Amino acid sequence: DDEADRLLKQGYTDLIERLHKQIPKITSDGCRLQMIVCSATLHAFEVKKMAERLMHFPTWGDLKGEDAVPETVHHVVCMVDPHTDSSWQQLRQPIHTDGVHDHDNVHPTNQSPETFSQAVKLLKGEYCIRAIDQHKMDRAIIFCRTKQDCDNLEQHLSQRGGQRFSCVCLHGDRKPQERKQNLEMFKRQEVKFLICTDVAARGLDITGLPFSKDLKYLSENTLNFPNLAVINITLPDDKSNYVHRIGRVGRPESMGLAISLVSTVPEKVWYHGEWCKTRGRSGSCIWYNEPNLLAEVEDHLNITIQQVVKSLDVPVNDFDGKVVYGQKNLNMGTGYEDHVEQLGPTVRKQTDLELQSQSLFLKRLKRLNWFDFGLLHDPKYFHGYEYIKYINKLTLKSCV
C-alpha cells in the first residue's frame, strides 16, 4: 500500500479494512499475511491508528525519521502583499484568474477584502514569471492549488513567452494518455515547466532537473552543483503535501530550491470535495489564510523558512564568515557516494531488524510444530534462516 496516509485521509479506511477482512490471514501452505504500507509522510496519525487495528506488532522502518525532508532542499518564501505592491493595478497581460470574484466589485478604489484577494491572484502570476527569470530557470515543477489554476497558469505562460515558458499540465482533468505524454515530454526536456496539482507530488520520481543551464550564472552565485526548483503558487492546505512537493527537488546528488508564494492577505478560493461536479470552476468558497498554513509547515518541519523580497532574489547570506545558502549540501557532500556513506549505518540497522523479524517468524513456526505438516521440509522453509541472511546481504550490498 503506497501513499498510505493519502488513502486514509481521502476516506478509504473502511474499504481497506473490508479488503483486509476478506484476505486470508494464513494460506494452506503456511504463508502468513504480511501488510506493508509506504509513504514519505508515514507517521501520520491515521496510519498509526490503522497499524494498531490491522497489524500485529508492526515494525516501523524509517531511514530519515519523522517529519523529515531532504537536507538538500532550501525553503524560500516570498510574501505577496497587494498593499505594498500595487503593480497589479497596471498589468498589461494579467493572468486569467479562477473567476471567484467575477460578480464582486473589485477595483483599486474599493479597498475591500475581495479586491485584495483578486490582487493576490494577479500578482502571483507575475511573481511566478519573475522567479523563472530571476533564477534563469530552464526546468522546474510548478504547483497550483486547483486544476483550474493549473490551466490558467499554463495559458498565461504560453501567452507571455511561448517556447521561452514552454509548459504542460498534469492533473486529474487531463486524460490518462495526455498525462503520461505530458510527463514524458517534461522528462525528455521537450518542455521546460511541469504545472501540476498535488496529484503529481506523490509517487513520481523525476530526477535530473537542473533549473539553469547558465553555468556562468551558477558560478557567479557560488552554486557549483546542479540545482533543482519547485515553485509553490499556493501553499497546500495539508502540510504533509508540502513534504511531497519539495521532495521532487531534493536528491542525493543535487541541491534543490523550493520557492513558495505566500499571500499576506486572505484569498477567496473555490472549495470542493471529490464529489464536486463543477470540476473546480464554481460552487462553494473559503477564505484561504496562507500565513497560518506557512506557520503549520514550519512547525511540522521544525524550521524557519527564509523570506526573500519581491524581486525573488535568493541572497548568499554570510554569518561568521560562512556561507549559509548551500551550506547544508556542502556539509553533507554533494556526491551520491557521500550520501550513501551517511545512510550506510541506518540501512544496516534496518537490515538487521528485518533479519530479526523474519527469524522470529521461523522460530514461531517451529514452536507450533508445523514440521508435522511438512511445511518446513521444503528447502525454502528448512533453510529459511540462511536464505534470509543471504537475501539481506544482497540487499545491504546493493544499498551501500
Curated annotation (Swiss-Prot):
It catalyses: ATP + H2O = ADP + phosphate + H(+). It holds the Pfam family Helicase_C. GO terms for cellular component: nucleus. The keyword Thylakoid does not apply. Its EC number is 3.6.4.13. The keyword Cell inner membrane does not apply. Residues 1-60 form the Helicase ATP-binding domain. One of its GO terms (biological process) is spermatogenesis. It is an enzyme of class 3 (hydrolase). PROSITE patterns: HELICASE_ATP_BIND_1 (PS51192), HELICASE_CTER (PS51194). InterPro entries: Helicase_C-like (IPR001650), P-loop_NTPase (IPR027417). Residues 115-316 form the Helicase C-terminal domain. Keywords: ATP-binding, Exonuclease, Helicase, Hydrolase, Nuclease, Nucleotide-binding, RNA-binding. One of its GO terms (molecular function) is RNA helicase activity. PANTHER family: RNA HELICASE (PTHR24031). This is ATP-dependent RNA helicase Ddx1. The gene is Ddx1.
